[in-house]
Design a protein with these regions (language model features):
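ATP-binding/phosphotransfer module of carbohydrate and carboxylate kinases, centering on a glycine-rich
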Residues: 6-11, 25-170
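Short beta-strand scaffold segments in enzyme catalytic cores
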Residues: 1-5
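Acidic, glycine-rich loop-and-beta core segments that form the ion-binding/anion-interacting portion
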Residues: 11-23
Length: 170
């Protein structure tokens, strides 16, 4: 979920589920099991995206593991600087860079805080680095106007729950 703060710092009171915004128009894109939609960001910027890309990058995942455990396997590979894990996170960063430019066009967002377990550790750093590269190289109209960033490591992991818990009561 994404909440909006206007240019004066006021909470706007409207919410949009960017997780379900399309980021892939390919008819064979991954289908979200909850919404039934294809190509949604939720399938690319979550552990689902990591799990899909891992075997293509040469990382074998035990099918008996839960999605969270599979993510941890890839994160461990990333901490060990394995090239396959870097490929996974670079790919996610590329998609994210293009998606951020798309979100900017639609919502005129300025600061984007990236949260969640996938953004944890070296992988999150590489995703951010790649997303910024894509924005600079391929979407120069966003240069100096759109600022994706990462919080501290603990906040990254708890992600949306921390953000939601810190909202003031209205």
């Amino acid at each position: 979920a994404v909440g909006y703060v206007d240019e004066k710092g006021n909470i706007t009171g409207w919410l949009n589920e960017l997780a379900f915004m399309p980021v892939d128009a390919n008819p064979d894109a991954m289908e979200d099991e909850w919404s039934g939609d294809i190509g949604c960001g939720v399938k690319y910027f979550s552990q689902d995206g990591v799990i899909k890309l891992a075997p293509r990058a040469g990382i074998q995942l035990d099918e008996s593991l839960s999605p969270a455990e599979k993510l941890k396997v890839v994160q461990k590979c990333m901490e060990e600087d394995q090239e396959g894990a870097k490929e996974v996170y670079r790919s996610i960063g590329t998609y994210l860079g293009h998606a951020l430019a798309y979100y900017y066009d639609l919502y005129h967002c300025k600061h984007v805080l990236l949260l969640g377990r996938v953004m944890s550790g070296k992988g999150g750093d590489l995703i951010l680095e790649e997303a910024k590269r894509v924005l600079a190289d391929e979407d120069p109209e966003c240069d100096g106007k759109l600022f994706p960033s990462l919080p501290d490591e603990k906040t990254r992991r708890v992600g949306q729950s921390a953000a939601a818990a810190s909202l003031p009561e209205v």
